[in-house]
Design a protein with these regions (language model features):
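The feature captures the beta-strand-to-loop junction immediately N-terminal to the Walker
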Residues: 40-42
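Helix-to-loop junction immediately C-terminal to a conserved catalytic motif
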Residues: 55
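Conserved ABC transporter NBD signature motif
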Residues: 63-74
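Short coil-to-helix segment of the ABC ATPase nucleotide-binding domain corresponding to the Q-loop/switch region
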Residues: 92-99
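Conserved ABC ATPase "signature" region
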Residues: 99, 110-128
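Conserved signature/switch motifs of ABC ATPase nucleotide-binding domains
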Residues: 131-134, 152
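Hydrophobic anchor residue at the start of the ABC signature
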Residues: 146
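Catalytic Walker B motif of ABC-type/P-loop ATPase nucleotide-binding domains
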Residues: 157-160
Length: 163
């Protein structure tokens, strides 16, 4: 079973004025495979901090987070990320951006192209593979980011303010 487990996560920041800010305080949860967790709250309440810890962009002050019974301590293809602004490489084509998600694996070039084409069709971008990403609308760019995330069939999908 794929579980995401947070145990006593704490994140403390120091402001430029030297003040202490507790962005996360003793956060505990278990998310089972197939479940969806939506974190809601006002600006500055720690939503993105929790996401950044889960994606291992930052380390918590204390506590741990586990996926499939393994502590998350570095990047891995078992997690997929869709950023608020897509975070696409504008100088690459749509297909090259989607393929970027597969670069962490050793894949046959023919199989890779087949997978990219399949995902472009799934997200409604069939025929756009050779289009530079910067020429797409915001919604189309979001679909490219989604295809890039899902092409590896991650166990966990992280989305920061999806549209």
């Amino acid at each position: 079973m794929s579980d995401l487990v947070s145990q006593n996560l704490n994140m403390i920041f120091k402001t430029p004025k030297g003040e202490t800010v507790h962005a996360l305080k003793d956060v505990n949860f278990t998310l089972k495979k197939g479940e969806l967790l939506t974190v809601l709250g006002p600006s500055g309440c720690g939503k993105t901090t929790l996401l950044n810890i889960t994606a291992v962009f930052i380390r918590p002050t204390s506590g741990s987070i586990f996926l499939n019974n393994n502590e998350i301590d570095g990047p891995g293809v078992e997690r997929g990320m869709v950023f608020q602004q897509g975070a696409l490489f504008e100088w690459l084509t749509v297909a090259e951006n989607v393929n970027f998600g597969l670069r962490m694996k050793n894949n046959d070039p023919v199989e890779t192209q087949k997978k990219v084409d399949e995902w472009l069709e799934i997200v409604g971008l069939k025929g756009f593979g050779n289009t530079p990403t910067y020429q797409l609308s915001g919604g189309m760019q979001q679909r490219v980011a989604l295809a890039r995330c899902l092409i590896n069939y991650p166990d966990l999908i992280l989305m920061d303010e999806p549209l």
